[in-house]
Amino acid sequence: ELMNGRIHVESKPGKGTKFTVEIPLELASEGDICKKELPEQTFMTDKNIGKRILLAEDNDLNAEIAEFILEDMGLIVDRVEDGVQCVARMEQKPAGTYDLILMDIQMPNMDGYKATQAIRRLEDKKKAGIPIIAMTANAFEEDRKKAFEKGMNGHIAKPVDAEKVKKTILSALR
């Protein structure tokens, strides 16, 4: 009644009951139709599943968030807590062990910029050429530029947006 409609019931013993609900509605115009945006791509693909990411992050909470996002993409995550450990891990492991490094900038012992420069100087060119993405609280345009100048391939500002992390990682893994 509130919608100026009616309900009609028609019943035939032994055959069943038919309910009819009538509600007067206006047809939506083309401009009124809300088009739902579908994601451009799925983040978990056979191509990405099992790829290994080296996460250099000293903050446990930030590491936990990053690990959750990356593992949700089907990626395998190894974590180190500073730049010294990151460079050492890259030196110790065979080339191709990792597909990408997600690097914090402000870490103890060696910051992300110095770690990136040390990795870029490794003798093994495959190791030296690994994609490195900055994941940092340094969110200004000058910080983004500095990350690229120091040899990084991408920049993600904290607090992280999961969709941006996924898109940046996928782009770097191509």
Model regions: which residues?
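C-terminal compact regulatory domains
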Residues: 1-174
